[in-house]
A protein has these predicted regions:
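Flexible glycine/proline-rich, aromatic-decorated loop/lid segments
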Residues: 226-243
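Adenosine-nucleotide cofactor-binding segment
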Residues: 156, 160-174
Length: 313
């Protein structure tokens, strides 16, 4: 959506985010439809709106006009970041897996939702690992309703465990499950599991386990508190296409999600082969930014007009 000094990527997939629009834009009036929101953004300072929106927990991103004009692919976060950061517990040693049976001994616990984390878990399951998907009884995975076919495919063959995160008994069950896992996949902001004493440092300080933290913008402050989804984060990373009028548009369908799921699975398999343990910090933003740079460095372009797919699966 167009603003004064660039474009905004705004994702309102969660019903509660619609209720934040009036205080975010600091105005009264009907903002119950996308057209009303677009009108309200005209002439507004996009960068200031993004800063306020992120403090409020809105999934919003900013694309400066200079990125379009210069076609540089420069992201909104200067300096760039590696695709992922891995904090190892010890010196890794190479471990060879010659058959799927070798990986079948590995237990994966997937705490993530939507697309990127579940895709990673699905690919690890395809490699032979045992996957247990944990869901909240009070906050079910939105993909189960929004994309039921994709949800069934990504979770096929997994063990499923539904827990009440307000129950101390269920939290103890989850702690035991995480403690005995070889690989943990989680997609929440760092403070969420830390508040429940279910983060890696609380459960297994220095323990021999591989833990994937899959976030929108990474774990470091202040990025670790920012909310984001595949479309708006891809825009922030410079991964977008342009229509015939030169206006930026999203690529594909939440493209940062499947890309990040694939990157995460490849990284985990590589680290598992080295018998490595530690925390793998991977963000949708870094993956999108990396892919943008790869496309440009190879002489490719992203100028085709966007056509939304009918099905994700």
């Amino acid at each position: 959506m167009t603003a004064d000094n660039g474009w905004l990527g705004l994702n309102l997939a969660r019903e509660e985010d619609w209720g934040l629009l009036n205080p975010w834009l600091q105005q009264d009036g009907d903002l119950s439809e996308w057209g009303h929101v677009e009108d309200a953004l005209l002439g507004r300072d996009a960068k200031a709106l993004v800063a306020r929106g992120r403090l409020m927990g809105l999934p919003v991103s900013f694309l400066p006009r200079k990125v379009i004009a210069e076609s540089t692919g420069v992201s909104e976060i200067l300096g760039g970041a590696p695709v992922f950061e891995f904090t190892s517990d010890a010196q890794a040693t190479l471990r060879h897996f010659n058959t799927a049976q070798s990986m079948s001994d590995l237990k994966v616990v997937d705490l993530s939702a939507l697309w990127a984390g579940p895709l990673c878990a699905h690919l690890l399951h395809q490699c032979g690992m045992q996957v247990t998907t944990v869901t909240s009884s009070h906050r079910p995975d939105g993909a189960a309703q929004g994309s039921p076919t994709l949800y069934k495919v990504l979770h096929r063959g997994h063990n499923h465990l539904e827990l009440d995160f307000s129950s101390q008994e269920d939290l103890r069950r989850l702690a035991d499950l995480l403690h005995n896992a070889d690989v943990v996949i989680e997609g929440s902001r760092p403070r969420a599991l830390r508040a429940l004493d279910l983060d890696r440092d609380s459960l297994l300080p220095g323990g021999k386990q591989l833990w994937l933290s899959l976030t929108a913008y990474g774990r470091r402050a202040p990025f670790g508190d920012w909310v984001g989804f595949g479309d708006d984060v891809a825009l922030a990373g410079g991964l977008f296409c342009q229509n015939k009028e030169g206006t930026p548009e999203f690529i594909g369908d939440a493209v940062a999600d499947p890309l990040s799921g694939i990157f995460a699975a490849l990284a985990i398999v590589k680290l598992v082969q080295r018998d490595a343990s530690g925390l793998l910090d991977l963000s949708l933003f870094a993956v999108a930014s990396h892919c943008r740079k790869k496309i440009h460095s190879s002489g490719g372009t992203m100028s085709d007009e966007y056509h939304r797919p009918n099905l994700r699966c």
